[in-house]
Amino acid sequence: MVLAGLLLLLTLLAGAHLLWGRWKLRNLHLPPLVPGFLHLLQPNLPIHLLSLTQKLGPVYRLRLGLQEVVVLNSKRTIEEAMIRKWVDFAGRPQIPSYKLVSQRCQDISLGDYSLLWKAHKKLTRSALLLGTRSSMEPWVDQLTQEFCERMRVQAGAPVTIQKEFSLLTCSIICYLTFGNKEDTLVHAFHDCVQDLMKTWDHWSIQILDMVPFLRFFPNPGLWRLKQAIENRDHMVEKQLTRHKESMVAGQWRDMTDYMLQGVGRQRVEEGPGQLLEGHVHMSVVDLFIGGTETTASTLSWAVAFLLHHPEIQRRLQEELDRELGPGASCSRVTYKDRARLPLLNATIAEVLRLRPVVPLALPHRTTRPSSIFGYDIPEGMVVIPNLQGAHLDETVWEQPHEFRPDRFLEPGANPSALAFGCGARVCLGESLARLELFVVLLRLLQAFTLLPPPVGALPSLQPDPYCGVNLKVQPFQVRLQPRGVEAGAWESASAQ
């Protein structure tokens, strides 16, 4: 009886909230509204949202549970909001799971826009670009070459490449963040991030974000998420303590040293509050969540596409041999020299266009009344950029669903993609991610030819339907044939 009464009360409150919201917006010229909730059942939501533009245009509203949101489906509207009117759209909604995962939105990716948020972002960006500038690129290259040596030992055997890429990117983040690439630490943080993301993506958590009052009811998934967060925070705090006990003022060994010392000297320009150690804690969390699985997923998509397009792989290897020397050369190439490898750059751009890791960018919130595409957008409205939809817009891209890296080699023929977002909320680790994609694919294609196991068993190019907010390739395996070895001899050796 009590439960029934509580449900009735919560339903009435939700209905009253909805009616009040509609009354406040009655005089505004709002984007058209998609009726019903069937869009929530679509297996590929970004593509479905793009299809709605044929009737509704590139900007419209829909309901995600009790929350009404505005969806942007074109490069033009996304750039209008996120670049030209970036202050209006720089906020972040206070979603229940976001607050839980980010220590009440104390991190950069999920934190709301404020002067304190700007100071936090500035400190972390400085650590990425200044604190490790001298060591970032050489270490990415060294860790990648060590990865290739491990793969050479397994040459001939089918390899689950997604996991290998995930461990590689985690080792890079571990070294840049903690100055430590020991296997035990890398595997511990890798497993921690995997567990956290799997739990966070579960439907039992996603439903709480759409219907927040359900958090008052028993939810085993919510308990598991809290346990994963507690484990994550314990591991990060242990590393912060180790750094505080051993660091030397005015010197930094890694990003954590830089940020801990930066907290002591950086002040917010005006207003209450200042950066605390908790902000460094959440910067570390951001680096692991945003810098491991995302880059590993893009690398996995690149391998999958190259298995489907061996002619592109052959041209890439010819380009590498021509510019850097034949086979598994160790010739030094820096990221500044990337203009020498236009096809490699175009291939990376095409993978990012077709398979942006987060196809629906994290939701934004308007900080004040604004407009997009001639429509009124009230203050506090949640806005979701459909990045994948913008990348598949037939009015912008010729044959948008085709994997065709050469489109980026045609002068002035194609605009840049928005895989890392844009404006104030652009991905903080974009420069590191692009460096990793460039170095890893370069070294991998220098050392190996990618082959499916067995012949003809190609990976699916349809996203994993159980991957949550990230766009992941379905599990697959690949054989890595060392270059410079005759195919027949290699096949005989690998069969023994």
Swiss-Prot record:
Known cofactor(s): heme b
Membrane topology listed for this record: Peripheral membrane protein
Pfam families: p450
Residues bound to progesterone: R232
Catalysis performed (reactions): progesterone + reduced [NADPH--hemoprotein reductase] + O2 = 21-hydroxyprogesterone + oxidized [NADPH--hemoprotein reductase] + H2O + H(+); 17alpha-hydroxyprogesterone + reduced [NADPH--hemoprotein reductase] + O2 = 11-deoxycortisol + oxidized [NADPH--hemoprotein reductase] + H2O + H(+)
Binding, heme b: S109, H364, R425, C427
Residue positions binding 17alpha-hydroxyprogesterone: R232
Domain of life: Eukaryota
EC number: 1.14.14.16
Keyword DNA-binding: no
MF (Gene Ontology): 17-hydroxyprogesterone 21-hydroxylase activity; heme binding; iron ion binding; progesterone 21-hydroxylase activity; steroid 21-monooxygenase activity; steroid binding; steroid hydroxylase activity
GO biological process, one term: glucocorticoid biosynthetic process
Disulfide pairings: none
InterPro entries (UniProt xref): Cyt_P450, Cyt_P450_CS, Cyt_P450_E_grp-I, Cyt_P450_sf
Any one annotated GO CC term: endoplasmic reticulum membrane
Localization annotation: Endoplasmic reticulum membrane; Microsome membrane
Swiss-Prot/TrEMBL keywords: Endoplasmic reticulum, Heme, Iron, Lipid metabolism, Lipid-binding, Membrane, Metal-binding, Microsome, Monooxygenase, Oxidoreductase, Steroid-binding, Steroidogenesis
Annotated PANTHER family: STEROID 17-ALPHA-HYDROXYLASE/17,20 LYASE, STEROID 21-HYDROXYLASE ISOFORM X1
UniProt remark on domains: The leucine-rich hydrophobic amino acid N-terminal region probably helps to anchor the protein to the microsomal membrane.
Recorded family membership: Belongs to the cytochrome P450 family.
Role of this protein: A cytochrome P450 monooxygenase that plays a major role in adrenal steroidogenesis. Mechanistically, uses molecular oxygen inserting one oxygen atom into a substrate, and reducing the second into a water molecule, with two electrons provided by NADPH via cytochrome P450 reductase (CPR; NADPH-ferrihemoprotein reductase).
Protein name: Steroid 21-hydroxylase
Record organism: Bos taurus
Organism lineage string: Eukaryota, Metazoa, Chordata, Craniata, Vertebrata
